[in-house]
A protein has these predicted regions:
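A short, Lys/Arg-rich alpha-helix, primarily the initiator
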Residues: 2-31, 108
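DNA major-groove recognition helix of helix-turn-helix/homeodomain DNA-binding modules
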Residues: 62-80
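Short, charged recognition helix plus adjacent turn
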Residues: 6, 81-113
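Residue-level signal for the short linker/turn that defines the boundary of a DNA-recognition helix
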Residues: 23, 33-34, 46, 61-64
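Short alpha-helical DNA-recognition segment
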Residues: 31-53
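Residues within the helices of the helix-turn-helix
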Residues: 26-27, 37, 67
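DNA major-groove recognition helix of helix-turn-helix
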Residues: 54-55, 65, 84
Length: 113
């Protein structure tokens, strides 16, 4: 039986995955030699604080902006989107791509993160 969106354990896992995505995005930005402000400018954001929110796990890269973010950090757009999908929608990622160990994010325990 599916869990409710209000399920605290699921919410904790979702939060942990968003934080992992944020760390991955920050590492990609830093590897590209960009500041948050420079990335924001390259992807057409008015405020760099959105980049900060995404990197801290409080926000998500919108689907329609993932190609621009990928280009800005020098990543293949398809792989970039696939990586974000595994963090943002792990069940959909599993259905589309299976449970390949290299693609599966580590499910965090409710108390960790």
């Amino acid at each position: 039986m599916p869990r409710s969106a209000a399920d605290p354990a699921k919410a904790a896992v979702t939060k942990g995955l968003r934080q992992e995505a944020g760390r991955w995005l920050k590492a990609a930005r830093e590897a590209a030699g960009l500041t948050q402000a420079e990335l924001a400018e390259q992807v057409g954001l008015r405020y760099y604080t959105f980049v900060s929110q995404v990197e801290s796990g409080l926000g998500r890269v919108p689907i329609e902006a993932q190609g621009a973010w990928a280009a800005a950090v020098g990543h293949d757009p398809a792989q970039f989107a696939r990586t974000l999908l595994r963090y943002y929608e792990p069940e959909l990622h599993r259905l589309l791509f299976g449970d390949a160990a290299e693609d599966a994010p580590r499910a965090r325990q409710a108390g960790r993160g």
